[in-house]
UniProtKB/Swiss-Prot annotation:
It comes from the Eukaryota. One of its GO terms (cellular component) is extracellular region. FMRFamides and FMRFamide-like peptides are neuropeptides. The modification Leucine amide is found at residue 9. This is Extended FMRFamide-3. The keyword Secreted applies. It comes from Karoophasma botterkloofense. Its main location: secreted.
Length: 9
């Protein structure tokens, strides 16, 4: 989900 993309930062 969108949070997963944020964690990749």
């Amino acid at each position: 989900g969108p949070d997963s993309t944020f964690l990749r930062l």
